[in-house]
């Protein structure tokens, strides 16, 4: 009895000592323990997502991949799998598992091994939020105290939800939602039992056990998890047998991008990082909605790439990427055996080689395995065997120079050989020999009413070059400058009916010691010509004469109204021919002024920003070209209503925290801000109408006086509300096409990144038929096709707009030869628009011509000729 009494006393003393020890340890560590109340308002590090205006995902930015989910959004089987392997008694214990702790203590006492785990899910949550993963006794004790605090603060479901969203699961994925996407490209509800088991097994060692890093390790750990799931009756034996027999197949998956706009994504990323800093931009879960329309964006990319492929094919085939083995063409009667092959690779070796090749856009690496008279066989990555028919090969004459190509091939033997690594792409469901285009291009479309960017593609491939040619490439614009020159002329006394002299200019430049002879392209001169017709036909010498008549200072002042920087505008007569260097975005913004009635809008791409919870943090309020609307003029905006996107965003981020949503009253109080009117509505209408003549031409074909404008191919769109202009620079180094309707302004540029390289000339190709495009590259031949392809998809959503003549313009019938009034109503006359007071006062007679000549006398010199645009 006495020993029982002693044992009870000893036990009581040990309990008291234990309580005192625990209390002492707690008070000793208390000051070092984090404040767990922060878990009540925890903000998970979630990547920034960028969307199109219609909600398609463009990109995701962030160090940590996370897809936060509510507990009720997770499949029960996934939750039960984690509980089975990590914490079976989770809903029963107070945050610590006493049985597990005793087991760990026993192992430590007997072997000194600290690797034995006893952490509950609550303890793991405490460690993930507040502590390191080091296996030290002090850290473990802190973990226990924190777990108890957390259990008092949060419900079990709240703890489990935080854990399943916070836990590190390898490959920079955090939480089950991200792991399902990263490893399997699925949502959590699409996971199979074996995939659930793989994910549930990752917390133990996410780096070593993830299926991308080691399929064998992942399989072994998966089987352990499946065993626990069977043991705890989460799954039955049939499900267990099926899951344990499944192979481990996994690869890295990115975010489910549904809209391709990498140049836009990068613009947004840079903007957000500049304003928020990297940590907030990449981890606050911001949802950025852009102005991009996904369907238009997809067509813009297709139009740009297809146009570059077409240009590339016109100029010839540069040969294979590589030759894996030598094949020598020999003469033989059997066309199947015309190559003698030296040490060809086996099928396995070919596939191993192809697996190492990276894809470029829609180009697929392939190895030629056999060549026939007018076809070739190839194998592409993945082992698919394909046949290249003659239609996909016949274009491939050899490249000689940018100006010359080889003869048209007659057989496939002249094009490819077995063992060659080539690039293929699919076009019209047929495989086609291809190559990475060397030329570059850019396309941008904006809403002229407010500057919203609807489509933007800054180059052939963002993965190849992150240089955004829409916003960064300043290139000479050629004849795309002429509408702005003509606009200045209309401000200084000229009309669309003014007669100009379309005749060669020969002027001696005493400073340069050479003669300046600007030429038309083509070198056709019509003599007396109306301003409307000269613009539509893109007459170079008329543009020079208009600049002389208006004056270079007046021209530059006028061009600055369109947002062009003075330093980009040469202060000499070459300005009239397009020596100014502008980006495509600057140029299309200028054209938007003609489309919207004379207002200068500011291009923007960020429409709104939502918090991770979907609350509106920012709504862009653009300046708008709005005639007759209840608006606030830009120059009268207060500090609370900044006049541009930059100021608006700066103000937002200075006054709002990420937790402060805008309310509906905030949005309602954002009145429409009117853009600055930089030219009159009458001026913009006259230029836009004259540019319609560039599309539809004029005169009477029936009477032999008909003529085409340089943009006549746009007629295929069958719309009368399109205004358009071509542009080509010296030696075809830059080609442009810009056009607009009242609802959409679009500019396309094509050229080489090397500004000194010409786009050259494509010779006639005997294999390609009558529909081919041969000749010197130009705006109409090289840039217009991409513009047309894009517009065929984009325009149908914008109804055709009737021409609304501005107040103040009059329409009178003029004689087409002299620009004077006429009483005739036949093919020799037409109605023309005039600003008040500029209408002709005389009637045309046989002997009257209203011709405006430049004052400088042509000096007939034989000095060196300078070819201009």
Predicted feature residues:
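Short active-site loop at a secondary-structure junction
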Residues: 67-72, 403-413, 436-441, 464-484, ...
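Short, well-structured active-site flanking segments
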Residues: 91-101, 174-177, 236-241, 490-510, ...
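Conserved catalytic neighborhood of penicillin-recognizing serine enzymes
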Residues: 110-135, 189, 256-260, 449, ...
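Mid-domain, small-residue-enriched loop/turn segments at the edges of structured enzyme/sensor domains
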Residues: 514-519, 551-589
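Non-catalytic, structured segments within soluble enzyme domains
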Residues: 22, 113-379, 546, 560-561, ...
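Active-site SXXK
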Residues: 82-83, 229, 300, 373, ...
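N-terminal type II signal-anchor transmembrane helix
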Residues: 1-51, 89, 108-109
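A penicillin-recognizing enzyme superfamily signal
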Residues: 78, 290, 294-297, 301-303, ...
């Amino acid at each position: 009895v006495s020993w029982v009494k002693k044992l009870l006393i000893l036990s009581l003393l040990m309990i008291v000592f234990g309580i005192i020890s625990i209390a002492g340890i707690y008070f000793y560590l208390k000051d070092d323990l984090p404040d767990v109340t922060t878990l009540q308002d925890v903000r998970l590090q979630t990547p920034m997502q960028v969307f199109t205006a219609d909600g398609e995902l463009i990109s995701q930015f962030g160090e940590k991949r996370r897809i936060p989910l509510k507990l009720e959004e997770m499949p029960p089987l996934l939750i039960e799998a984690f509980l089975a392997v990590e914490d079976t008694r989770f809903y029963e214990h107070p945050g610590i598992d006493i049985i597990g702790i005793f087991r760990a203590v026993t192992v430590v006492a007997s072997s000194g091994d600290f690797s034995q785990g006893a952490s509950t899910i609550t303890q793991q949550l405490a460690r993930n939020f507040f502590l390191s993963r080091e296996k030290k006794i002090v850290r473990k004790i802190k973990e226990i105290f924190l777990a108890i605090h957390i259990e008092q603060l949060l419900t079990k479901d709240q703890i489990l939800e935080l854990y399943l969203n916070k836990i590190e699961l390898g490959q920079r994925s955090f939480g089950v939602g991200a792991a399902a996407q990263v490893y399997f490209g699925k949502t959590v509800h699409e996971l199979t039992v074996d995939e659930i088991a793989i994910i549930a097994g990752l917390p133990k060692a996410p780096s070593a056990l993830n299926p991308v890093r080691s399929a064998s390790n992942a399989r072994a750990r998966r089987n352990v998890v499946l065993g626990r799931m069977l043991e705890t009756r989460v799954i039955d034996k049939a499900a267990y047998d099926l899951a344990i027999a499944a192979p481990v197949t996994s690869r890295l998956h990115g975010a489910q991008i549904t809209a391709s706009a990498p140049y836009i994504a990068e613009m947004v990323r840079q903007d957000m990082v500049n304003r928020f800093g990297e940590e907030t931009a990449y981890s606050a879960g911001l949802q950025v909605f852009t102005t991009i329309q996904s369907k238009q964006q997809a067509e813009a990319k297709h139009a740009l790439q297809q146009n570059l492929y077409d240009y590339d094919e016109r100029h010839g085939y540069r040969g294979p990427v590589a030759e894996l083995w030598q094949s020598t063409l020999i003469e033989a009667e059997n066309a199947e055996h015309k190559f003698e092959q030296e040490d060809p690779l086996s099928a396995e070796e070919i596939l191993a080689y192809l697996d190492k090749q990276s894809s470029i856009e829609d180009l697929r690496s392939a190895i030629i395995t056999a060549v026939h008279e007018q076809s070739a066989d190839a194998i592409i990555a993945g082992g698919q065997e394909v046949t290249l028919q003659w239609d996909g090969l016949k274009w491939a004459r050899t490249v000689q120079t940018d100006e010359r190509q080889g003869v048209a091939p007659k057989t496939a033997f002249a094009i490819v050989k077995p063992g060659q690594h080539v690039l293929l792409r699919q076009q019209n469901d047929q495989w086609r020999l291809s190559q990475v285009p060397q030329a570059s291009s850019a396309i941008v479309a904006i809403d002229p009413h407010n500057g919203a960017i609807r489509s933007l593609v800054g180059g052939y491939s963002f993965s190849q070059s992150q240089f955004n040619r829409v916003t960064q490439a300043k290139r000479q614009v050629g004849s795309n400058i002429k509408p702005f020159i003509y606009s200045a002329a209309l401000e200084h006394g000229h009309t669309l009916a003014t007669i100009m002299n379309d005749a060669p200019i020969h002027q001696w430049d005493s400073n340069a010691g050479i003669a300046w002879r600007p030429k038309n392209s083509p070198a056709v001169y019509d003599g007396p010509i109306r301003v409307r017709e000269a613009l539509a036909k893109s007459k170079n010498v008329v543009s020079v004469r208009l600049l002389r008549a208006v004056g270079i200072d007046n021209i530059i002042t006028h061009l600055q109204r369109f947002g062009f920087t003075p330093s980009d505008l040469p202060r000499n007569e070459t300005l009239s021919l397009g020596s100014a260097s502008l980006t495509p975005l600057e140029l299309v913004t200028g054209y938007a002024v003609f489309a919207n009635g004379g207002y200068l809008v500011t291009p923007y791409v960020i429409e709104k920003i939502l918090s991770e919870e979907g609350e509106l943090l920012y709504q862009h309020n653009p300046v708008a070209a709005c005639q007759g609307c209840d608006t606030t003029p830009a120059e009268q905006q207060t500090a609370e209503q900044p006049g541009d996107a930059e100021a608006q965003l700066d103000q937002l981020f200075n006054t709002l925290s990420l937790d402060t949503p805008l309310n509906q009253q905030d949005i309602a109080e954002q009145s429409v801000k009117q853009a600055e009117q930089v030219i009159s509505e009458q001026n913009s209408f006259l230029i836009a109408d004259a540019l319609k003549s560039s599309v539809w031409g004029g005169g009477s074909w029936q009477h032999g006086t008909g003529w085409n404008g340089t943009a006549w191919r746009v007629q295929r769109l069958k719309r009368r509300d399109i205004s358009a202009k071509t542009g080509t620079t010296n030696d075809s180094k830059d080609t442009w096409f810009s056009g607009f309707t009242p609802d959409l302004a679009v500019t396309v540029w094509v050229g080489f990144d090397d500004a000194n390289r010409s786009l050259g000339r494509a010779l006639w190709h005997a294999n390609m038929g009558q529909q081919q495009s041969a000749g010197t590259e130009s705006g109409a031949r090289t840039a217009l096709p991409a513009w047309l392809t894009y517009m065929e998809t984009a325009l149908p959503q914008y109804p055709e707009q009737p021409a609304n003549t501005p107040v103040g313009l009059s329409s009178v019938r003029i004689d087409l030869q002299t620009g004077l009034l006429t009483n005739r109503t036949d093919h020799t006359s037409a109605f023309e628009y005039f600003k008040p007071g500029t209408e002709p006062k005389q009637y045309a007679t046989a002997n009257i011509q209203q011709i405006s000549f430049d004052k400088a006398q042509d000096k007939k010199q034989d000095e060196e000729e300078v070819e201009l645009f």
